[in-house]
Each structure stands twice: as structure tokens, then as C-alpha cells.
Design a protein with these regions (language model features):
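The feature captures the catalytic groove of carbohydrate-active enzymes
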Residues: 2-52, 64-139
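Short conserved active-site loop signatures built around small residues
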Residues: 55
């Protein structure tokens, strides 16, 4: 019998202190798995993978996401309490519990719901109630977009402070783990516009050929 081995803390090697690890909030991993399933089916033209468990995977992960999406007073669906691919942002400044409306998560979910719709149109059996809710959610997931048309990494991201990278480089030299340097200084990367992994930019790589879901 196994026991729980999920990582809940990790070591900051700058100050040698154990810090909370909230990477379990990166629910977007399920979207990437479905996306890879789609890539496989497109490259091989082998749809037997869908009838051999693939469709079940799509349906069950869709159930999870539709349950997590909540309709707001603005008429848009919002997904809260998650982390995007960028591990430097675990929550809003001074808060806990993840961030809201991560662009990567919301647009990848929109893509998944679109594919679910396409599969239904091709004759694959999708539960009626699931499909009906997918139609509502896929066109109304919220994105935070500024006046210049730039997509924010997540809701209120552009309200975060900017980082003086030159100052950090002058002080430390190697800043590839600037998050640990910040935490050792007693501040949090959650407060700043700084990223570890490609997050919003990953959308362009994944969905650029689809016009970033124009009119999503």
C-alpha cells in the first residue's frame, strides 16, 4: 500500500528555508494531456485512440473544468484558484489560493471545448448535458485584455509592480531563480511582473495556427 508523496514544501537554496509548494494548483496539466491527444490523432489520423479511452479522458477532464468554471455578474465564466505554467505566481499579493482567469488555462479550455463540439458533430457520443454546458462556457470564458489589446497572464496581472532586472543582475549576477532571491529578501514574486515559464506566450505556440481562437 502506497502513501501520499505529493510535494507540499520545497527548499529555497538561497536562504535554506523550506517554503510552501503550491504547484498542485497547476490544473492546466490535464489540458496539455488532451492537447497532446489531439496532436497524436492529427498526425497519425488514427482515431481509434479516441474510442480506446481517449474520449473518456476528454469527457472526464471537461466535467472537471465545467464544474470549476463559475458564471460571474459580468456574464462571463471565471476560473479561480489555479496556477498557470508560470510557477513564480502562486497567488495574489498577500493572499493564498491561486490566481483567477489564467489566460493559458482559459484559452486552452476554450480550445478543448471546441474540440469536444467537433467530436460530437463527427458522431462521437458526448453526454447531452455536458455538451450543452460546454456550448455556454466556451464562448464566455473571461480574459483580461488591456487597452492595447495585450492579453494579461491572468486577471489583474498588469496591476503588479515591474522588476528592475538590471539592479538584480548587478547585485547577484545569476538571476535565473530570481524568485528565490526575492523571497530571501523578504518579498514575493507574486507582487511583480516576472515569469519563470512561458505562460501566455505558450498559447501562441499551441494555438497560433488557429488564429488564437478568433472570436472565442
Amino acid at each position: 500500500i502506497g502513501d501520499e508523496q505529493s510535494q507540499f514544501v520545497h527548499l529555497n537554496t538561497v536562504n535554506n528555508e523550506w517554503e510552501p509548494d503550491n504547484s498542485r494548483r497547476q490544473r492546466h496539466v490535464s489540458l496539455a494531456i488532451v492537447y497532446n491527444l489531439w496532436i497524436y490523432s492529427q498526425l497519425t489520423e488514427d482515431e481509434s485512440i479516441l474510442t480506446d479511452g481517449g474520449l473518456d479522458l476528454i469527457i472526464e477532464t471537461t466535467k472537471f473544468w465545467l464544474n470549476k468554471a463559475e458564471l460571474g455578474d459580468d456574464g462571463r465564466y471565471h476560473i479561480d484558484g489555479v496556477m498557470g505554467p508560470d510557477e513564480y505566481h502562486e497567488a495574489y499579493p498577500g493572499q493564498e489560493g491561486g490566481i483567477c482567469d489564467n489566460a493559458y488555462t482559459n484559452l486552452m479550455l476554450t480550445w478543448q471545448l471546441n474540440w469536444l463540439t467537433e467530436l460530437s458533430e463527427k458522431g462521437f457520443e458526448i453526454p447531452k448535458e455536458l455538451l450543452e454546458k460546454a456550448q455556454k462556457v466556451r464562448k464566455k470564458l473571461y480574459l483580461d485584455i488591456d487597452e492595447n489589446g495585450v492579453i494579461a497572464q491572468y486577471a489583474k496581472y498588469f496591476e503588479l509592480k515591474e522588476v528592475d532586472f538590471a539592479a538584480y543582475e548587478a547585485k547577484y549576477g545569476d538571476i535565473h531563480r530570481i524568485d528565490r532571491l526575492m523571497k530571501a529578501e523578504g518579498i514575493s514574486p507574486d507582487e511583480y511582473q516576472v515569469a519563470k515559464q512561458a505562460d501566455t506566450l505558450m498559447l501562441i505556440y499551441n494555438l497560433g495556427h488557429l488564429g488564437m481562437l478568433v472570436g472565442y
